[in-house]
Amino acid sequence: MARETIIHVEDFTAAYEGSVILSEVNFDVYAGEVFVILGGSGCGKSTLLKHMIGLYKPARGRILIDGADVVAADRQERMDILRKFGVMYQSGALFGSMTLLDNVRLPLEEFTDLPPEAIRLIALMKLKQVGLAGFDNHLPSALSGGMQKRAAIARAMALDPRVLFLDEPSAGLDPITSAELDELIVSLARNLKMTFVIVSHELASIFAIADRVIMLDKKVKGIVAAGKPRELRETSDNPWVRQFFSRQASLDG
């Protein structure tokens, strides 16, 4: 049975002030998988993510989310596309003066016509799904970094998106908290049938959560390897893969 393609990136090229950052990138993301965009600093990971969610238009190419063209969409079509995905940026970006409940309510108030009580109940359910039941009236400053990340994921899930984009979700977390967040991501993907697209450079997280990986390289300006993470590490003869894993091992050591 053919897998459902939820994201299709075709001949994608990104440029900034005349300089090409990524060139002729092609890949698909399948529904229900955890898909990781891996690479070192400056390779274009976050640039690719920002184009995928429609913040920028590529120099060339197409990006389809659930069949809708992010690049060619008009205003109404873009609003429809926005409902299909949620985003958690690296900072988490919770509003510090608002409770967790109010933070999670924001997308529902902005993009739906639901009555206040229905919005409140949905927001409470999202907090429960990320392990934050009972913390709805807490301010972000009262929570640990890991709990703030969970709250940011809950907000990104508010509209029941088909895809969640996470930019370096483990950034700033200690190894134990990072592992707990990995477990949450896998649980959400499997139990809620959600698709995750994650930008990361951390190997431990990748092997814990990823179904498939693409590896970007700054010099090549594109994909140098793609596949299941353990296959890349254990069986690949790709020199770019070996170099990346060797560099990461030395940093971890």
Question: What is the predicted function of each stretch?
Answer:
Residues K219-F245:
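Conserved beta-strand-loop-alpha-helix hinge in the C-terminal portion
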Residues I53:
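Helix-to-loop junction immediately C-terminal to a conserved catalytic motif
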Residues L139-L143, M147:
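Conserved ABC ATPase signature
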Residues V70-G86, P116, L232-S236:
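ABC ATPase NBD coupling module
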